[in-house]
Amino acid sequence: LLAFLFPIIVSANTDGPVKLGGRLFIDGGLFTKNSYSTHAKAEITDIRLTGKITLPDEWYTKIDVGFASNKVSLKDAFVQKKWGNNNFRIGYMLGMCCIEQSASTNDYVFMTGANAAETFYLGRRVGVSYTFSQNKYYCSAGLFCGDGAEYDDKVLPGYNATLRGVFRPLNEAGELLHLGVGGLFRRPDREKEQKDRLVTFSSNGVTGLSLRYWT
């Protein structure tokens, strides 16, 4: 497999408290050995429209909608409040497990995140989170719903909890050394007919191309 990645970020932000933006990610690959006649492939792996509103007293809200794979999916819809070094957030958002997931995917060096971050990534969930950040220390905790936002009487809902901590002994302009640890607790949903709850982990690897091109 020879992979070539094309991250294209398209944004159009307006001045003022209301900002609109978007992005388009194209992932391509040249497969030297597979069972398909086509060995080169490119896909639009992510396309989004984003709206952000900054309100007085450090209130902030964001709505992010994705349109990749011929589907409309909600990516983010949350309200955030900041008090000095403290940040509170509630809504539909990332269930973060590691410090890397604090950064926007627009800032990733590669198309995907690190395998550890991708594997233990909760996905987006309805929940609440708290973050404390200053020059030397950072900590964040979150509590989120289970595997879905809608339930019926046949499903016993689960929940998820995350915790992250970072110590930055060196954090100056052009210089950074940080040491971090992250924790994840998962209690997945369970149908009442089943006895066990099932936890699954997966990762995108180095590309977002469809799995069929890997075979």
Predicted region positions:
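Outer-membrane beta-barrel biogenesis signature
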Residues: 3-23, 29-38, 189-214
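Outer membrane beta-barrel
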Residues: 14-32, 36-149, 153-188
